[in-house]
């Protein structure tokens, strides 16, 4: 049977009237269910986002709290480390020395030309220079840390250099006696030692002579001088330890100003040690007058040179029997050298520090500097290009004859006049620099 268009439309109308409401109801229910599902999913997403935001805020709050606590802890540790941590050499209050007027002495620049230098070899510093029989001798060292440091006594004729003896640690000073023996001040992590070395064509033999005083190890031995009578004078920079070498010990004493440096004399015949001078704020150098009657002592922190009778005993710096031969110096005096013509050469370890002496009557900032470590302390003491590295003064008249400037290194550690030249040694130098006199 054929269904016409009208019949087909009637069938669709009947079907829509019969099934349509159910389909509409089904679609409506499905849409409602879908909307409810979407709403629930949206609520879950919102709840999850709110939960995540709350957790994030809580985590940030905990992190901020932890950061604050950590920062406060670090600050407290830093305050303790720099301001309250116990140190071996607490700073002492002292009166800063005056600064003398200009002397009008002749100005001489240390030559920087490599042709005028005396090369010693691969070394990191020079602590002492002496001359004997037309040859120059220098105490040169290698090794950044004292426990790894070795030192050589190097002899040079101006063209060839050779090490004649070697020691562990730092060879801070040496001097020849009338018999040709070498007296050495040696510094190791265990303390200081006064030694005697005999040298011949077969080599050198080093003998320890003084290793302790009153049962305690020697401190930072800094210099040695032998009198015409054979007495051996040696200086201990300060009572503080010297685990980082002589330069470090001298910087520590400059900051602390404990005035515990001493000068002793050893009698080889009697094998006795006696104190000559105490109360020195950094005994950094020694020299004897040409006749051996007067002993000159560098006082680093007081920026002066003390003069005492070489036969005197148990004196105190600035007290009876001890006079300031040269005071108000423009730098911190170190090594000394007295020429046979009566001229005293004074080397300056560092230039005068205005900051240090401004805080002489206060211990707070100096205590912080002492606790801050070696790198910070090294930056505190420098020498500008125009600052004197050494001066020459007449012992007879007290007239300042010559001022030497232009040493490239920060610390002038050694000075030695030889004929028409003056030779200088410094920390960080592998050669001897020269200037005319």
Locations of regions flagged by a protein language model:
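Sequence-structural signature of mature extracellular/luminal beta-sheet repeat domains
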Residues: 79-437
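Membrane-interfacial loop-to-transmembrane-helix junctions in polytopic alpha-helical membrane proteins
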Residues: 2, 59-62
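Membrane-spanning helices that line or support transport/gating and their immediate boundary helices
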Residues: 25-34
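Membrane-cytosol interface motif
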Residues: 35-46
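Juxtamembrane low-complexity tails/linkers enriched in Ser/Thr-Pro and polybasic
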Residues: 44-60
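Hydrophobic single transmembrane helices highlighted by the model
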Residues: 1-25
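Internal/C-terminal transmembrane anchor helices
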Residues: 61-83
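Short hydrophobic alpha-helical membrane-anchoring segments
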Residues: 16-21, 77-85
């Amino acid at each position: 049977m054929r269904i016409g268009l009208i019949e087909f439309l009637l069938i669709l109308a009947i079907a829509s009237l019969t099934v349509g409401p159910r389909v509409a109801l089904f679609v409506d229910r499905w849409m409602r269910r879908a909307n409810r599902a979407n709403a629930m999913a949206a609520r879950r997403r919102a709840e999850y986002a709110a939960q995540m935001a709350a957790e994030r805020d809580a985590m940030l709050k905990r992190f901020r709290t932890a950061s604050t606590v950590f920062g406060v802890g670090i600050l407290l540790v830093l305050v303790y480390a720099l301001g309250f941590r116990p140190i071996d050499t607490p700073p002492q209050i002292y009166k800063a020395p005056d600064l003398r007027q200009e002397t009008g002495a002749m100005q001489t620049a240390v030559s920087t030309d490599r042709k005028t230098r005396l090369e010693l070899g691969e070394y990191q510093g020079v602590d002492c220079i002496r001359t004997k029989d037309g040859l120059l001798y220098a105490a040169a060292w290698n090794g950044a840390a004292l426990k790894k440091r070795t030192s050589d006594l190097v002899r040079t004729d101006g063209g060839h250099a050779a090490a004649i003896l070697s020691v562990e640690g730092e060879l801070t000073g040496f001097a020849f006696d009338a018999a040709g023996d070498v007296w050495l001040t040696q510094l190791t992590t265990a303390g200081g030692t006064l030694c005697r070395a005999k040298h011949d064509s077969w080599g050198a033999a080093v003998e320890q002579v003084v290793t302790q005083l009153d049962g305690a190890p020697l401190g930072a031995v800094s210099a040695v001088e032998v009198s015409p009578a054979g007495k051996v004078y040696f200086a201990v920079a300060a009572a503080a330890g010297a685990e980082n070498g002589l330069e470090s010990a001298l910087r520590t004493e400059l900051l602390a100003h404990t005035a515990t440096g001493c000068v002793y004399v050893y009698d080889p015949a009697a094998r006795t040690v006696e104190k000559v001078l105490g109360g020195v704020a950094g005994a950094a150098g020694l020299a004897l007058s040409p006749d051996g009657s007067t002993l000159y002592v560098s006082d680093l922190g007081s920026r002066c040179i003390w003069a005492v009778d070489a036969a005197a005993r148990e004196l105190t710096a600035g007290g009876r029997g001890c006079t300031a031969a040269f005071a108000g110096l423009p730098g911190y005096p170190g090594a000394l050298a007295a020429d046979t013509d009566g001229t005293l050469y004074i080397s300056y370890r560092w230039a005068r520090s205005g900051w240090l002496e401004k805080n002489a009557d206060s211990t707070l900032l100096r205590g912080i500097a002492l606790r801050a470590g070696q790198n910070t302390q090294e930056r505190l003491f420098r020498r500008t290009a125009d600052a004197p590295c050494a001066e020459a003064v007449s012992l007879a008249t007290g007239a300042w004859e010559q001022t030497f400037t232009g040493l490239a290194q920060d610390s002038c550690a050694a000075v030695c006049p030889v004929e028409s030249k003056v030779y200088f040694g410094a920390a960080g130098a592998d050669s001897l620099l020269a200037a005319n006199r």
